[in-house]
A protein has these predicted regions:
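Structural recognition of the beta-strand scaffold that forms the well-ordered cores
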Residues: 72, 81-82, 107-109, 126-129
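Histidine-centered metal-chelating micro-motifs
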Residues: 69-71, 89, 107-118
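Glycine- and acidic-residue-biased ligand/ion/polar-headgroup-sensing regions
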Residues: 76-95
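A short, N-terminal "cap"/entry segment at the start of jelly-roll beta-barrel domains
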Residues: 4-5, 14-58, 91, 100, ...
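Ligand-binding loop in jelly-roll beta-barrel domains
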Residues: 112-137
Length: 144
């Protein structure tokens, strides 16, 4: 009797799950979710802290020519980047530590620390960049 009840419970759960899955995908085509990254810290090991006032999300793409060097800068708020193409080396100029990112990598940039980036590859770098800033502010400060 226990086996029958357990089997019935599993069949009912499977039927309910199938209905929910079908409701989520009304086209009849399968939906595949592939996790790309999960981070709780920046590239330099800081905890990710969000702005305390009204948050604005800014999304942009960056195209960085082969051999190009970005100026030394910092970000007062969280910045995330997905490397769509190319190879980028980011160096924390305060510590000298460098990280190299390639196509498919996800970057959680350091917050409030001076750094610069160099396209170390032979092809252009293309980044999808997402900033979370206090509304009305910018997220890049150039070092003078």
């Amino acid at each position: 009797m226990r086996n029958i009840l357990a089997s019935m419970t599993l069949l009912l759960a499977a039927a309910l799950f199938a209905d929910v899955a079908q409701a989520l995908d009304s086209s009849g085509m399968p939906v595949v979710v592939t996790p790309l990254a999960s981070r709780a810290e920046t590239a330099s090991g800081q905890p990710i802290t969000l702005p305390q006032k009204n948050v604005q999300v800014l999304v942009s793409t960056y195209d960085i020519a082969a051999g190009a060097t970005l100026p030394v800068h910092k970000h007062p708020f969280p910045r995330y980047a997905y490397v769509m193409a190319g190879t980028l080396q980011v160096t924390n100029v305060e510590t000298g530590k460098s990280n190299t990112y390639k196509t498919g990598d996800f970057i959680v940039e350091m917050i409030g620390q001076w750094h610069q980036a160099i396209n170390v590859g032979t092809d252009p770098v293309k980044l999808l960049v997402i900033d979370q800033v206090e509304e009305g502010t910018k997220n890049t400060v150039l070092r003078q």
